[in-house]
Amino acid sequence: MPIKILSPQLANQIAAGEVVERPASVVKELVENSLDAGANKIQIDIENGGANLIRIRDNGCGIPKEELSLALARHATSKIADLDDLEAILSLGFRGEALASISSVSRLTLTSRTEEQTEAWQVYAQGRDMETTIKPASHPVGTTVEVANLFFNTPARRKFLRTDKTEFAHIDEVIRRIALTKFNTAFTLTHNGKIIRQYRPAEELNQQLKRVAAICGDDFVKNALRIDWKHDDLHLSGWVAKPNFSRTQNDLSYCYINGRMVRDKVISHAIRQAYAQYLPTDAYPAFVLFIDLNPHDVDVNVHPTKHEVRFHQQRLIHDFIYEGISYALNNQEQLNWHTDQSAVENHEENTVREPQPNYSIRPNRAAAGQNSFAPQYHEKPQQNQPHFSNTPVFPNHVSTGYRDYRSDAPSKIEQRLYAELLRTLPPTAQKDISDTAQQNISDTAKIISTEIIECSSHLRALSLIENRALLLQQNQDFFLLSLEKLQRLQWQLALKQIQIEQQPLLIPIVFRLTEAQFQAWQQYSDNFKKIGFEFIENQAQLRLTLNKVPSALRTQNLQKCVMAMLTRDENSSSFLTALCAQLECKTFNTLADALNLLSETERLLTQTNRTAFTQLLKPVNWQPLLDEI
């Protein structure tokens, strides 16, 4: 068969195979067109699951008469004009394929009127011929699109449609997803003349929360944790459910980028990683997240359905989302859920606002009425400076740099430690502790493990007790070693090294200080620098920006620690001791974890500081217990 150019009709039907998968795809494309037209009231009428009729009516800007036929042509749009527009997309649609593709597999009627016109006009097209007919009509300002007999000319496609109930369920889910990100827009969804969904404009807090509850359920709102996380051009907002509100299937996960619903592996991985320590592998988190970023940094022109995106800085986006969700889960700042309006008005800080782009948009082009997207992205005077308040903007959870995607499988060292842990003791070692004493330890101290693992030439670790202490043996003497005190000693030793390894923060922490706090900073700045902190100081604005931290403290709540150090009593303990006292000790669930800490601390010990370690050893006297036998 010779190579030849396909006819426009055949090309449109091929494109329809990508854009128009089922009736829900038609609804999505047409509702997005209505939103791009500036509509704040949209009605969706469905008959027989969308196979017989899909009608979308809006009060947007409308389409001028002279552009009606052009609207049905392929690759015709008012939303972009050049390559620069394509690389910075904020509109929901931009490809100019939807109406052409839909009209090629259905009987499509488009009726529209602009505010400047005194009468409306209607264009009709159907099937492969794509011939359009324009005639006057009666219609208010806005647009109505009717799609009748979907796939009437492609029987093979039509027979793949599911039952009316199933197809309408997909349409319902599309409307629910769109309604979650457009609080200021009213949506009405009907099926066979019956109102199924009706979302009124949600201007007030109580109305907005009711919409979220109507879509996600009251239980989700009651268990929701608010997120408002910012860094330069990045803004993460919305809600994540507490871990106890997990799902058995991934049916309550809504994510939007610049108002566009998306499915992205980078985002999914970041969310799953943030929940990893809270949820089992067969449970799914529930969330409604809005991500706003500079449109130059994300490519939405990846797939005709526009569900997939590609980030220019995937690791930055991944870690930004991970940090924001981790902070929300760690702090458990639950959303206040009120049904009484007077109570709601007293909680303005919880107001849910529709995400807005942080970029300047130049006036709209005439062809697109009030909502053509031709953005001009000027850097604002303080574009790269986070919003400041009396408390730091990025609290409590600091970045740990780029994260690798290693599996959670144990390393070879861990496997060797566990093998030794499970090894049967030699008879000579078993004689070191009497059977009676061992039984007494098990009954009174809740010993988790009684295997002996040699940690050094002097001390042997016998057991981890209540996840708080190590039972150690040296010759015939026994000692208890507090893991909390050991960890604080390890921090002090690590921060006293001549060369301290530093960890750059992916997202710097910004502090807005009072005059008293800034004076304290000037007093302690050398101390911070000595132990590996790197700040940028802005004395005129009483502001500090933390860029690097000592690697030993990279997982700590450094925002809390720094602020505590700047408000501490000057007559208290030394700076380093006071700082280590503010750090949060980890929980040791296995003997191997405790042994790693002990080994790391011993590595840092020298002849001059070994006394500090010796002072942590508390002798255990077995004689009173042996006398009772």
UniProtKB/Swiss-Prot annotation:
What are the recorded GO MF terms, alphabetically?
ATP binding; ATP hydrolysis activity; ATP-dependent DNA damage sensor activity; mismatched DNA binding
What InterPro entries does the annotation carry?
DNA_mismatch_repair_CS, DNA_mismatch_repair_MutL, DNA_mismatch_S5_2-like, HATPase_C_sf, MutL/Mlh/PMS, MutL/Mlh/Pms-like, MutL_C, MutL_C_dimsub
Question: What CDD domains does the record point to?
Answer: HATPase_MutL-MLH-PMS-like, MutL_Trans_MutL
| Alphabetical keyword list | DNA damage, DNA repair
Highest taxon of source: Bacteria
| Gene Ontology biological process terms from the UniProt entry | mismatch repair
- Report the leader peptide range: none
Q: Which GO terms describe its cellular component?
A: mismatch repair complex
This chain's function reads: This protein is involved in the repair of mismatches in DNA. It is required for dam-dependent methyl-directed DNA mismatch repair. May act as a 'molecular matchmaker', a protein that promotes the formation of a stable complex between two or more DNA-binding proteins in an ATP-dependent manner without itself being part of a final effector complex.
NCBIfam families in the record = mutl (TIGR00585), PRK00095.1-1 (NF000948)
The UniProt entry's sequence similarity note says: Belongs to the DNA mismatch repair MutL/HexB family.
Q: What is this protein called?
A: DNA mismatch repair protein MutL
